Amino acid sequence: MTCLSAARSGHLEVLKWARQHDCPWSSSTCAFAAAGGHLEVLKWAREHHGPWDSATCFFAAAGGHLDVLRWAREHGCDWDELTCAYAAGGGHLEVLQWVREHHCPWDEGTSDHAAAAGHLEVLRWAREHHCPWSRSTCHRAAMGGHLEVLQWAREHNCPWDAGQCASVADEQGHAEVAQWVRAPAP
């Protein structure tokens, strides 16, 4: 836990001390450093054979830490669809654009995360670039109370289950969303 806490907080000297005293670490150490945008901590961990995995990239993306993400990719860190999804969920359009320029895969999770967090600009960009979406995209927008996102998604033919969207909006206290979903179509 000491290595994780040090990495998450960006305390390189604490991490060095912990490793000198045989404190165990895992791929989460690098992922937590990336999540906090602590590039120097990440570099040190990798120089000392700290393990990493795709979580390093998706946590860097979630935090909008493009410098960390670039460095990780330049040094061979794997990534997957969650990198795009977490960038979208964090509202980090510049990061999402960069990862797609560098051929990071995506799936409907990118649209879902953008909708869940109310990031309409990110969702628009993703759809303009042919990112898939599903009924879950509308469901997540309704759950988050993001009426503008839900309206835009429906105007652009995103599939949905109106009953589920209304129910989840009610459950989450988003009366305006539930009313809009239940309103008769013009």
Where are these regions (language model features)?
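Ankyrin repeat (ANK) tandem alpha-helical domains that serve as protein-protein interaction scaffolds
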Residues: M1-P186
